[in-house]
From Swiss-Prot:
This is Protein C42. Signal peptide: none annotated. A motif (Nuclear localization signal) lies at residues 349-352. The lineage of its organism: Viruses, Viruses incertae sedis, Naldaviricetes, Lefavirales, Baculoviridae. InterPro entries: AcMNPV_C42. GO terms for cellular component: host cell nucleus. Pfam families: AcMNPV_Orf101. Keywords: Host nucleus, Late protein. It is found in: Host nucleus. Belongs to the baculoviridae C42 protein family.
Length: 354
């Protein structure tokens, strides 16, 4: 095997396992690409960490593939394939063990609906218009799925995919790529005579970047956790979880480590204290409690989803009810505009402190 082949194999492993090359084994493997090095010493601990990482990624990919297959059959969008003789497996090498065999990708259901959603959303974010339309998170998801699965519009997907990162500028494109991108955009919008240039592309990309960075899309996410202990076939309740995990909860002990003592430093500088109070004065205490309860809501929803537990509105409302005793004893001033009487439900009302 030549040095170029070895480098290609190592680069393939890097893209599959550790794209940023943060593991310790990469400098040791790259020594094989040198013509002057006759012997290569590989650290055992680095090799074991590399193999453990490979095993975990393989287990995660296998679990995700099984979940996708089960979801497809549960939704009625897939049928059992006909039995066919399995082809002979190709010869496996050390560097080609993780290369997956090519498989036919399942066709999406009703791609015309995905195309219509993508065309409507991109047309709204690309062209100058005075009308306003309502879009949902599913419209953005359908647009990205359609662009990613369509070969003709895959270059447009790559451009919008970079908007998910913290990049302020679009990537550099050649003249051929610019011409192909503009032709692709005109074809998708079905407006061959509309003047479309790179300014239109920049407006579209910046609009999608703001859309991807919105709190609605950032909080509406699916978290995949490793292991099979986080999934349940049947939905449970909070009371059942407390009974099931009561023994483990009782065994928990508070743990705290103080590095340099627990004394609170004393400040005798009145000017600094007054300046600090001026910074804290615009932020009422009730607003701090509201932000904390809001953060607890998102964390609670994620924990409920992981445990497949039924969400009870009254359990969440106890967070605000427990803070009402503090609010009753607080001084009510005219500047206080935030309060804690916010409950979930159809009859929820918001009161203002006067």
């Amino acid at each position: 095997m030549s040095v170029i082949d070895v480098h290609i194999r190592i680069d393939s492993l890097r893209r599959l396992i550790d794209e940023n090359m943060q593991m310790e084994i990469w400098p040791q493997l790259l020594r094989m690409c040198s013509d002057t090095v006759s012997d290569v010493d590989v650290d055992t601990s680095a090799l074991m960490a590399f193999l453990v990482t490979v095993a975990r990624k393989s287990q995660t990919a296998f679990a995700n593939a099984n979940a996708a297959t089960a979801s497809a059959f549960a939704a009625g969008g897939a049928r059992a394939p006909a039995a066919m003789p399995a082809p002979a497996p190709p010869a496996q090498t050390v560097f080609g063990a993780l290369v997956s065999a090519p498989s036919a990708e399942p066709a999406l259901v009703d791609m015309r609906r995905y195309r219509a959603a993508a065309r409507r959303l991109i047309q709204y974010y690309s062209l100058n218009t005075t009308t306003s339309s309502e879009f949902k998170v599913r419209d953005v998801v359908m647009t990205m799925i359609f662009l990613q699965r369509s070969e003709n519009y895959h270059q447009l997907f790559k451009l919008l995919d970079t908007a998910m990162d913290d990049f302020t500028c679009r990537p550099q494109l050649t003249e051929a790529q610019v011409s192909t991108l503009l032709h692709t955009l005109r074809t998708l919008l079905e407006m061959p005579t509309t003047p479309i240039d790179m300014t239109t592309v920049d407006v579209m990309r910046s609009s999608f970047a703001r859309c991807f960075a919105s709190p609605v899309l950032r909080y509406a996410k699916v978290v995949l956790l490793q292991g099979e202990t986080v999934s349940r076939d049947e939905r449970t309740t909070l009371e059942e979880l407390l009974v099931e995990r009561g023994d483990n909860i009782q065994k928990l002990q508070p743990q705290q480590y103080v590095a340099s003592g627990s004394e609170i430093p004393f400040c005798d500088d009145p000017e600094f204290i007054n300046r600090l109070l001026k910074h804290l004065d615009p932020y009422p205490l009730s607003r701090m409690y509201y932000n904390a309860a809001n953060s607890m809501f998102y964390t609670t929803m994620e924990n409920y989803a992981v445990a497949n537990c039924k969400f009870n509105i009254e359990d969440y409302n106890r967070i605000f009810k427990g803070a009402e005793s503090i609010k009753k004893h607080a001084n009510k001033t005219a500047e206080d505009s935030d309060e804690l009487d916010i409950y979930l439900g159809t009859t929820a009302k918001r009161k203002k402190i006067i």
